[in-house]
C-alpha cells in the first residue's frame, strides 16, 4: 500500500498556573519537532490570545480546544475538580442561570461558539470535545463556521 504520513503534534494549556513554564516547555516541544499545537479547552479569548502572541514567532499552527459545557454542575466540576481547567466566573454564572437540561446545553454551545468566533482568525482550526454522548453539541458549535464545499 501507499506509505503513511505522520506529523507530530503537542498539547498546551494557555491557562496554566505556571504559564512561563508552560511556554518554555512548548518551545522545547516545538524545537524537538512538534509541528502543531492543540490547546486544552479554553473559555476566555484573552487567555488564548496571550499564548498565541507569545508563540507567534515559532510559526506553528494552533488548534483551539473547545469543550461545550452541558450544565452548571458540569462547569463547576470541570473548574473545581479537573486539574488545569479554568472556567471564568462569568461563564460559570451564565451556566448557573441556564441550569440544566436543554437550556443549559444551548448556553454551553453558545459559549463555545462565541469563543470560536473570537479566535477563528488567529488559529488554524478547532477541535470540539462534546460532553459524553452529546455529539450533536459538536455539530451545533461548528454550524455556520464551516466553509461550504
Label each PLM-derived region with a short phrase.
Residues 1-4, 11-16, 57-115, 132, ...:
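Active-site pocket-lining/capping segments in soluble small-molecule metabolic enzymes
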